[in-house]
């Protein structure tokens, strides 16, 4: 049996050590912004921050959910910061970002789940950086009537909401969420605003079966999702769900091939793939693939 306490060589990454990495870190700190890169202990932080790519986490640093895979703090959430959208827009401008990814903690305590705050962030970025494309990675807005409409009207270039895992694992891995609610949210955004690219991602290595992963692909295509990401689950701490399997690079290539046969415009599948990993480059490929589909 494989030693799951030791990560395989294909998972290992270099420790961050570049000047640009520290410059990005200082800017984020000085503007009092949170990033999912830090809070979720992302393995790609060194590479991304060295390129001045960062995923800002809005709506505070404390989540109202306690998913078994996630390293973000859970508990009583922070007060909403009305100046956060302006500081975020300033960071985008100072980093000279061509493409920005914005995510958030879950805010079940807010009437709209934080949807209007996302909309304000998009609006502020559009004012100061009109040529920057905007990708948002949102919570599921469970039982938040009108949230999808607020998001669709804000017109992000990409709407991302992750299903995270297969439905059979939701009770243990994502107990506060509902699989079919996530599918419904993705479908509703596309229905409300067909010109917004939709995206979703999932982790593997949590104990799912291959046929379950393929079924999720089919469900996402039924919801008109354009872009699928698949990455290896990594246990943040001993208090989180254990890794059931380290999926090999060859198995990821197989999943990518299968996903492409389903009709996704874009598929990214590898051990280190995360929702916002190479998001700027992937967005360009996504647009190119869409244009090719139009003329084919």
From Swiss-Prot:
Q: Which residues of this UniProt protein bind [4Fe-4S] cluster 2?
A: 63, 67, 70
Question: Which Pfam families does this UniProt record tie to the protein?
Answer: LIAS_N, Radical_SAM
Per its Swiss-Prot or TrEMBL entry, what cofactor is needed?
A: [4Fe-4S] cluster
Instruction: Cite the GO molecular-function annotations of the record.
Output: 4 iron, 4 sulfur cluster binding; lipoate synthase activity; metal ion binding
Which compartment or compartments is the protein found in?
Answer: Cytoplasm
Tell me which CDD domains the record gives. Radical_SAM
> What's the Enzyme Commission number for this chain?
2.8.1.8
Domain Radical SAM core positions: 49-265
Annotated PROSITE patterns: RADICAL_SAM
Question: In which domain of life is the source organism classified?
Answer: Bacteria
Pathway linked to the protein: Protein modification; protein lipoylation via endogenous pathway; protein N(6)-(lipoyl)lysine from octanoyl-[acyl-carrier-protein]: step 2/2
Residues given in the record as [4Fe-4S] cluster 1 binding sites:
37, 42, 48, 276
> What does the record's cofactor remark say about binding?
Binds 2 [4Fe-4S] clusters per subunit. One cluster is coordinated with 3 cysteines and an exchangeable S-adenosyl-L-methionine.
Pull one GO CC term from this UniProt entry.
cytoplasm
> What InterPro entries does this protein map onto?
Aldolase_TIM, Elp3/MiaA/NifB-like_rSAM, LIAS_N, Lipoyl_synth, rSAM
Keyword Transferase assigned: yes
Q: Which SMART domains match?
A: Elp3 (SM00729)
Q: What NCBIfam families has UniProt attached to this entry?
A: lipA, PRK05481.1, PRK12928.1
What PANTHER family does UniProt report for this protein, alphabetically? LIPOYL SYNTHASE, LIPOYL SYNTHASE, MITOCHONDRIAL
Family statement drawn from the similarity comment of this UniProt entry:
Belongs to the radical SAM superfamily. Lipoyl synthase family.
What name does UniProt use for this protein?
Lipoyl synthase
Q: Taxonomic lineage per UniProt?
A: Bacteria, Pseudomonadati, Pseudomonadota, Alphaproteobacteria, Rickettsiales
């Amino acid at each position: 049996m494989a030693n799951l306490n030791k990560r395989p060589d294909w998972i290992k990454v270099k420790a961050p050590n570049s000047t640009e990495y520290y410059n990005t870190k200082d800017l984020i700190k000085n503007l009092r912004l949170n990033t999912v890169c830090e809070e979720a202990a992302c393995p790609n932080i060194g590479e991304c921050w060295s390129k001045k790519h960062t995923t800002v986490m809005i709506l505070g640093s404390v989540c109202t959910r306690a998913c078994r895979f996630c390293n973000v703090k859970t508990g009583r959430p922070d007060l909403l910061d009305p100046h956060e959208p302006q500081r975020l827009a300033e960071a985008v401008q100072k980093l000279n970002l061509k493409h920005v990814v914005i995510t958030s903690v879950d805010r079940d305590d807010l009437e709209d789940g934080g949807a209007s705050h996302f909309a304000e962030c998009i609006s502020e970025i559009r004012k100061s950086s009109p040529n920057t494309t905007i990708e948002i990675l949102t919570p599921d807005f469970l039982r938040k009537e009108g949230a999808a409409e607020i998001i669709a009207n804000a017109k992000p270039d990409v709407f991302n909401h992750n299903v995270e895992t297969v439905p059979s694992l939701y009770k243990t891995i994502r107990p506060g969420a509902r699989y079919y609610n996530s599918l419904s949210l993705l479908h509703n955004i596309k229905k409300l605003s067909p010109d917004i690219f939709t995206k979703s991602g999932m982790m593997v290595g949590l104990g799912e079966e291959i046929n379950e992963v393929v079924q999720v692909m089919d469900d996402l295509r039924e919801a008109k999702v354009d872009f699928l990401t698949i990455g290896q689950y990594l246990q943040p701490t001993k208090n989180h769900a254990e890794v059931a399997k380290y999926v090999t690079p060859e198995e990821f290539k197989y999943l990518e091939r299968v996903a492409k046969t389903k009709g996704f415009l874009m598929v990214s599948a590898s051990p280190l793939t995360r929702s916002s990993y190479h998001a700027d480059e992937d967005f360009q490929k996504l647009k190119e693939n869409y244009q090719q589909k139009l003329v084919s």
